[in-house]
Structure formats: C-alpha cells, structure tokens
C-alpha cells in the first residue's frame, strides 16, 4: 500500500464477486465504495476458459482503474491497493459528507495542522503501539509494519518528516546497544511476517 497519514481501509479496495447464470458477468461489490476509482468487469460465471479470478489495477500508469477478470464459479474476493492513499481518503470523505447533505467545496487540500487563530483541532485519534504490534504479529500486515517502522524513526529522530531509513537507523542503534553488530543483520524494510527469517534467534 501507499503509506500516508490519511488511510482509508489501509488504502486497499476489496472486491467481492458473486456468480450469476453460467456465462454471465459476475456481480461485483467493492468496499469501500468510492468514485475515486473506476471498475472494469470482464468476469464470466462458471466459465473455466475465462482463466483464474483476478483483481488488478493499471499501476504502471499510477491509475486507479480496477479490472476484475476471470472465472467466477463461487463467491470470490480479491484486493488491490489504490494509488495516492491520501487523495483516496479525502475524495471519499467529501463524497460521504455530500451524501449526508453536508455542503463541501469541490476542491480540497491537506497539510500539517498549524494551530492559529482560524484553525482549531476538532478531534485527534491515536492507536497504541501495543495494538499495532498485536496486529503485526497476528498476520503478515505490511502496512502496519511500515507504519511501525516510521513511528520508530519519528521517535528516534524527533522529526516530523521521516523515512523508512530513519526507522532502520533506530533498529540498528538498538542492536548495537544490546551488544551486537548491526552490519551482521539484513534490515530491508518494515515488511510483515515472512515464511523465512533473516534474523537469527539471538
């Protein structure tokens, strides 16, 4: 996923396909629903010649046209990340406000909050580190793992604009503090759990 401070459903769209009559196009449901992305449905119901069920996006062009294809012989579910997660969040947020009858300007912008005479923080939401760690350890969750890496970097540097490398530097410093040699470990990113381990039991 494209990590940003504004994430809606982890920047991912879940597409569920339901079969119809044999040879017909399957019915699709997308969560979260939004006009930020478009949907192309070329699925076929109970038609093995259509190939395996697949959900994809025109990622080479940084587009958000989701294409769902292949054979649907039963309920099928797939996920795809959306380009520019912050814009996905804002676009869908304003769309939901308008659906509730709340008037909004067609344009939007976002930046760091600067408290002044015309700006007031209306709400603040925080997730505990323990809750994030629990999620990371439960299943391979790259988004939360990358977010945790960035959080480590922010705590390590004290800065507001941080990168994955800042988080890796914090981990290397901890390894050294524990009496080990950081260069002996392959620290690549904040990726979630893996079927193979780069780090030894020490």
Give the role of each language-model region.
Residues 170-173, 183-202:
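C-terminal soluble interaction/assembly domains
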Residues 1-183:
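Conserved serine DD-peptidase/penicillin-binding transpeptidase domain
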């Amino acid at each position: 996923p494209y990590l940003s401070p504004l994430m809606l459903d982890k920047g991912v769209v879940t597409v569920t396909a339901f079969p119809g009559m044999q040879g017909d196009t399957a019915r699709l449901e997308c969560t979260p629903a939004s006009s930020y992305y478009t949907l192309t449905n070329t699925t076929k119901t109970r038609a093995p010649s259509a190939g395996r069920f697949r959900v994809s996006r025109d990622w080479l062009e940084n587009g958000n046209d989701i294409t769902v294809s292949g054979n649907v012989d039963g309920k099928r579910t797939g996920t795809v990340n959306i380009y520019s997660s912050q814009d996905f969040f804002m676009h869908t947020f304003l769309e939901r406000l308008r659906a509730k009858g709340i008037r909004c300007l067609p344009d939007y912008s976002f930046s760091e909050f600067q408290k002044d005479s015309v700006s007031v923080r209306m709400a603040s939401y925080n997730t505990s580190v323990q809750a994030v760690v629990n999620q990371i350890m439960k299943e391979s969750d790259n988004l939360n793992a990358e977010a945790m890496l960035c959080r480590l970097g922010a705590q390590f540097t004290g800065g507001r604009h941080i990168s994955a490398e800042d988080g890796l530097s914090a981990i290397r410093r901890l390894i050294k503090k524990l009496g080990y040699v950081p260069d002996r470990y392959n620290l690549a990113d904040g990726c979630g759990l893996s079927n193979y381990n780069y780090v030894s039991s020490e």
